[in-house]
Amino acid sequence: MVKPRLVFLSIAGPKDEQLYLEIIDPKEKHLLARYQYLGELSLDVINDLVNDGERTSNDCFLGLLGVEEDISTYAFYSNTKVKFILAVKAPDYVVKETEIRQLLRRIYTIHTHAVCNPFSMDLTPETLKTSIYFKESLHQLISDWNIH
């Protein structure tokens, strides 16, 4: 049985602008267009979920958005309307949503610390790409999760 592994992380701003996209496995960089497409599809699902008038839950974790072949996408929607999309490849393994929920909350915390840095005056989409704290913390979190 092949254990699950993270495929990509996408972070989108309040207006669905892409703030960050990280393809976890460097060998899959050639699949950038596919992962961008999955991220865009996920944004449509997120917007449908959060704009649903019947939605009663205030939980930021939106859960499983969809499955494309062997890649499952999950989402977290912050109170500032920042969207976190995480894709997991799990061909023969059931991924526990509680694990994904915890992982997305930790990513959200890392993101918050990076963009709320009082010493950084530059809060643009480049903030995450240039933040050493964000990159190192995220890479450590991802490597820990992939080997658990």
Curated annotation (Swiss-Prot):
Q: Name one GO cellular component term.
A: cytosol
Pfam families per record: Sedlin_N
Q: Which Gene3D superfamilies match?
A: 3.30.450.70
GO annotation terms (biological process): endoplasmic reticulum to Golgi vesicle-mediated transport
Chain ranges passing through the membrane:
none
Q: What is this protein called?
A: Uncharacterized protein C15A10.12c
Classification from the root reads: Eukaryota, Fungi, Dikarya, Ascomycota, Taphrinomycotina
